[in-house]
Every structure is written in C-alpha cells, then in structure tokens.
C-alpha cells in the first residue's frame, strides 16, 4: 500500500511548531545530523529573491531571517497549521499560501512563476513510494528560466549511534521516510531536472543548489 504524504506532515501541530526551532534547528541539527542551522540559513542569504516560493515551510525560521529581502513570498505545504503559523511569522509581508501535495503535478498557474525556490528538510519527511523525484520535477516547472532553487534533506548516513537510533524511531513513526535516501539518489534527481546544480554533504545532510530547469 502506498503511504500518504499526510503521514509525514501530521506531526506538525501548533504545539510542535512552537518547539520546532529549539528541537529541530538547534538540538537535532547540532548534535544528531551535524549540520548547523547557520549553514542552512546561508543558503537563503545567498540565494533568496524578492519573488520567492518556500516548499515545506516548517516554522518559517529561515524566511524570518531574510524577510528584508522579500517583496512577496509564496508558501506551499500540505499542512494548514504550518501555512497559518508561517504566514503569521511573516505578517508584515505580502504572503500567499497554497495547500499542495508536492508529490502530485502542480497546476499550470505556478509554471515559471518564481525567481527563487527553497525546499528545506522536506524530502526526508515524504513517503517513499518511489516518486520523490516528482518534487524536483515540480520545482523545475515552477522556477523561472533564470531563477535559482535550493534546499537540503537528511539522508540515511549517520555518524553516531544516537543519530541512528533517533532516525530509526522517526522512520518507524512515519515522521521520516528516508531509508532509501542517499547522496546518489538526490544527485540523480538534480541531474534529471536541472542543467546546472551543486550538491554537497554536511554531516547527515545533503545541501543542493540548482538552476537552468529542464522542462
């Protein structure tokens, strides 16, 4: 039976979102995945544009820290709690929200619409039904011809027993579904959908930047 995209999103209640910055961005990134939040924030500082789309919005921490560079921002997520929470974080900006399953084809209204797109810490939460590449196909469709997209995801490569234990627990609970996610699989998705890309691994995290969408 195929797993639903909802499975990895339902954990993000309003209470969890209030704890997200400390638990996920400080503790987990620093001590489990060995990729500091400051390194991921740099992706936004280097690449965000005035016309930006964020897919899988989390707590809005990164966007809040670059909001002076945003004229308008679109938020795309399956979880309405996340969309409402981040819209409030960015309440002084022009924000559009879209409740979308990114593993399905996006509507034509989004095609070539955004000059920058971020997809941070989403891939490892999505159900592994053999179609995770659909995320990158959709990003390629939505990115403008001269735009840049970027993101990160936790892969199945851990440096400590504690990280392995936590990752296994998250996979068992459906919070993660990344046992088949590798550096090579992420690079394949990038290569298939973008003419130019860079990818590197920091701890257990793949960090990538891509441009010149193939569509």
Where are these regions (language model features)?
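Core SAM-dependent methyltransferase catalytic element
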Residues: 193-215
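A short, conserved alpha-helix within the catalytic core of class I
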Residues: 126-138
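Class I S-adenosylmethionine-dependent transferase superfamily signal
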Residues: 66, 138-140
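Conserved Class I S-adenosyl-L-methionine
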Residues: 161-184
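Class I SAM-dependent methyltransferase SAM/SAH-binding core
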Residues: 53-106
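Conserved beta-strand signature within the Rossmann-like core of class I S-adenosyl-L-methionine
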Residues: 146-154
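Conserved class I S-adenosyl-L-methionine
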Residues: 1-47, 167
